[in-house]
């Protein structure tokens, strides 16, 4: 069985690569009233008074949306958002496994630049950051630019910044191996 067949088997068996789990054990009425109603009203009031309190009272502080329209999926091309969902789930688990960050895949059904920007703007309050993934060039650059102008959270364009980091690391290592010093 090759890697593709094994991967297909894994995906079919697990039916996805991540799940949402509760951090609160709701075992009785008191626990329910603290996690949900009526107790949840107080964190809501605090956030309404001071929006930065969302970083204290919610998972916003550690949650990143992995957003894609599926228009430039590595090795597959323009396969659309839904077909790209396994890739976005994979990226989400990389965030969790290697950085301890809760990545949430968000695939879009359309590929219009303004629609992408609007969709991300609308969901942004939930997240502490946005990771743009597999959006075709040159659209990806203008989507990133517009989102950085409009949002108050970090926007990371994975295909651009991730590649730049890898190239910079390779050049730094080559420089070191060649016995060169910075200066």
Predicted region positions:
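N-terminal ligand-binding/catalytic initiation module
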Residues: 1-153
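Active-site nucleophile and cofactor-binding loops and adjacent substrate-binding regions
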Residues: 156-165
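Short internal alpha-helix immediately C-terminal to a glycine-rich phosphate-binding loop
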Residues: 164-183
């Amino acid at each position: 069985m090759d890697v593709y067949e094994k991967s297909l088997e894994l995906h079919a068996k697990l039916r996805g690569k991540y799940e949402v789990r509760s951090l609160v054990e709701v075992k009785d009425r008191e626990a329910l009233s603290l996690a949900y109603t009526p107790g949840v009203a107080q964190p809501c009031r605090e956030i309404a008074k001071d929006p930065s309190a969302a970083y204290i009272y919610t998972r916003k502080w550690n949650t990143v949306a992995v957003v894609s329209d599926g228009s430039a999926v590595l090795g597959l091309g323009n396969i659309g958002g839904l077909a790209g969902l396994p890739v976005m789930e994979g990226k989400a688990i990389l965030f969790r496994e290697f950085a301890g960050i809760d990545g949430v895949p968000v695939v879009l059904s359309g590929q219009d630049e303004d629609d992408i920007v609007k969709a991300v703007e609308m969901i942004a309050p939930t997240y502490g950051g946005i990771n743009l993934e597999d959006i075709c060039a040159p659209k990806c650059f203008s989507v990133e630019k517009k989102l950085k102008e409009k949002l108050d959270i970090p926007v990371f364009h994975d295909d651009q910044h991730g590649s730049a980091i890898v190239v910079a690391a390779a050049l730094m290592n080559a420089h070191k191996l060649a016995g060169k010093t910075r200066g």
